[in-house]
C-alpha cells in the first residue's frame, strides 16, 4: 500500500473486514513528509473483500482490496 505525505503528520493505516471490524493496524505513528510503501501479507485473513483506511492529519481515504488465497 503506497501513500505520500505533503507534511509531517500522525498517520494511521488500518485494515477492516466487510463488517467494519478492524483486522490489522499497519501504521500508527508520526511520519515526516515523503512517500511510503507498506507491505501487507494478510496471511491470517480469509479470502474476501477488505478495506484499508488511511488517516493522515485531516486527510482520510478508504479503499477496497481483494484478498485471494
Question: What is each stretch, according to the model?
Answer:
Residues 1-69:
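C-terminal outer-membrane/trafficking sorting elements
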Amino acid at each position: 500500500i503506497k501513500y505520500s505525505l505533503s507534511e509531517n503528520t500522525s498517520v494511521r493505516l488500518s485494515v477492516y473486514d466487510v463488517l467494519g471490524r478492524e483486522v490489522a493496524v499497519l501504521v500508527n505513528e508520526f511520519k515526516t513528509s515523503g512517500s511510503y510503501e507498506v507491505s501487507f501479507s494478510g496471511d491470517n485473513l480469509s479470502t474476501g473483500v477488505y478495506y484499508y483506511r488511511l488517516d493522515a492529519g485531516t486527510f482520510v481515504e478508504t479503499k477496497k482490496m481483494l484478498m485471494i488465497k
